[in-house]
Amino acid sequence: MKKATQSKAWTTVQIARHPERPQFLDYVGEIFTEFDALHGDRLFGDDGAMVGGLARFDGQPVMVIGQHRGRSTREKLKHNFGMCNPEGYRKSQRLLDMAERFNLPVFTFIDTMGAYPGVGAEERGQAEAIATSLAQLSSLKVPVIATVLGEGGSGGALGIGVADRVIMLSHSIYSVISPEGCASILWKTAEKAAQASEALGLTADKLQSLGIVEYVVDEGEGAHLDPERVMQNLKVVLKQALDELLPMDANERCEARYQRLMKFGSENLGVAS
């Protein structure tokens, strides 16, 4: 019997989830300088899954916000496996307000299975927190650049994913649902996750072909194999994106962001026929 070959999309999913894959704070340490983390949403508490603060990018003051998952058991618990609670999104809203007040470009970094689905999160307004973040990012006057580092899962990713430019690492994924979740809904079994991953179109090259992502950063066989090279490749692309956005007038930039969002799902993207 011929051995079945593993789908390219499912291979990408597995690389995106690799336990040694660089995480948000690894990139911060390599790409930015003088990072100073800020804590709390001034409403309920601090969320370890959402990390953010002031930093410098090539000497320029910026705001950096991202989801951190953790590696050790202690770290994973501290950062809630990268699954944000409402206070995480409200913390990011506070930092976005600060960025606009002081005219700081914003860099967001996505790496989450999704927003935390616990009862407490729902009681504290998870959906409202994400919706408010979407609205705020849509109208922010400063440049916003979002990067998908590993998993970009559903609304949890979108909460910091609305941007002027979106970047994906070549083995990252970005989707409305996990392949396992999709398979469980469509086929009543998570065993068809590989098939679901193909159907979801969650890979960087597919999303770039649809115009949803502007840049794809090459990471070879996986960022965990040569993290320093991948981080430097990403830094070059971040600089390119920022250089494109800085000369634009704030109103012009907001209008371009609006038009970028409005074209999603249109015929010119090849989604509808």
Curated annotation (Swiss-Prot):
Task: Give start and end of each CoA carboxyltransferase C-terminal domain.
Answer: 1-244
Question: Which HAMAP family does this UniProt record tie to the protein?
Answer: AcetylCoA_CT_alpha
User: From what organism does this protein derive?
Assistant: Acinetobacter baumannii (strain ACICU)
Superkingdom in the source lineage: Bacteria
The catalytic activity of this protein is classed by the Enzyme Commission as 2.1.3.15
Keyword Acyltransferase attached: no
- GO cellular component terms given for this protein: acetyl-CoA carboxylase complex
| Gene Ontology BP annotations | fatty acid biosynthetic process; malonyl-CoA biosynthetic process
Q: Which reaction does it catalyse?
A: N(6)-carboxybiotinyl-L-lysyl-[protein] + acetyl-CoA = N(6)-biotinyl-L-lysyl-[protein] + malonyl-CoA
> Would you tell me the protein name for this molecule?
Acetyl-coenzyme A carboxylase carboxyl transferase subunit alpha
Report the subcellular localization. Cytoplasm
Any Pfam family: ACCA
Named in its record, the pathway it takes part in is:
Lipid metabolism; malonyl-CoA biosynthesis; malonyl-CoA from acetyl-CoA: step 1/1
PANTHER family attached to this UniProt entry: ACETYL-COENZYME A CARBOXYLASE CARBOXYL TRANSFERASE SUBUNIT ALPHA, ACETYL-COENZYME A CARBOXYLASE CARBOXYL TRANSFERASE SUBUNIT ALPHA, CHLOROPLASTIC
The free-text function statement in the UniProt record for this protein reads: Component of the acetyl coenzyme A carboxylase (ACC) complex. First, biotin carboxylase catalyzes the carboxylation of biotin on its carrier protein (BCCP) and then the CO(2) group is transferred by the carboxyltransferase to acetyl-CoA to form malonyl-CoA.
* Any GO MF annotation of the entry: acetyl-CoA carboxylase activity
Task: Tell me the subunit arrangement.
Answer: Acetyl-CoA carboxylase is a heterohexamer composed of biotin carboxyl carrier protein (AccB), biotin carboxylase (AccC) and two subunits each of ACCase subunit alpha (AccA) and ACCase subunit beta (AccD).
What is its EC class?
A: transferase
Q: Which gene encodes it?
A: accA
